[in-house]
Amino acid sequence: MPELGKTLITVPDAAGGAEHAVEVWDADSAQFAARLRKMAKERRKWAARAGVFAYRIYDADLPNYALAVDLYREAETGEAAVHVAEYEAPSHIDEAKAARRLEDALAIIPPALGVPEARV
């Protein structure tokens, strides 16, 4: 059962297999999850063709999720790590709401990209 005030969304894993239930504050976070997954798939194909091991997956594509998400992959092992940077929210956005959106994104990123939480 989700924490009070939170809702469950389903996030497919990076390989397109299992779906993961993720607790979020805003049900609209599903839109961020879908965008992140789509961009990761496109960039993963490009990176494989180009022989690139570090690249940006997401760069504030959606106005409510003002983040940059970069993926770094070990050339030898293929093990990945993700760096997330938050852009400053506009002054008209409530700070608590922006913090909840960041929390939602940080919950979505590990299953969506197939990276352990400790590597985000």
Where are these regions (language model features)?
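Glycine/alanine-rich phosphate-binding loops at beta-alpha junctions
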Residues: 89-95, 111
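Non-catalytic substrate-recognition/targeting regions of SAM-dependent transferases
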Residues: 63, 67-73, 98-120
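Generic alpha-helical secondary structure signal
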Residues: 30, 34, 96-103
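Non-catalytic accessory regions of SAM-dependent methyltransferases
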Residues: 1-83, 87, 110
